[in-house]
Amino acid sequence: MANAGVERERKFLVDDLDAALAVAGPGEHLVQGYLDQAGDQSVRIRCWPEDGRAVLTVKGPRSGMSRPEAECEVTPEVAELLLAACGPRVVDKTRRALDVGGEGVDWIVDVFHGRHEGLVLAEAELTTDGAVIDPP
């Protein structure tokens, strides 16, 4: 199944992991590889090893806080081939939803592992153009 739409997001570096995890839901492990990145456009494969899901995503150029995005599910076999094609451009992380308020904003926190150990990012996904971001 494929879908296309508009992505609206902002990312923030997290200084206090304990505070972020205090308002976070259960985590899900994922592996993400970048097949191509040119400027602010990218093609990536994201895999959830625990349940075998995998999604290929193409993100277009930014316009303000928005950019076009298209996603399509792929089989685990295709995902494995695509991840291998990423070479060293692969990240391993645990993603958790943050239980914080905010009309029209969904928050997540990514805790990175491996060579990016110690990196923690919070991401605000805006569901509407007029959503106001108030970092927790």
Task: Describe the residue ranges of each PLM region.
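Phosphate-end processing signature that detects enzymes handling 5′-triphosphorylated RNA
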Residues: 1-136
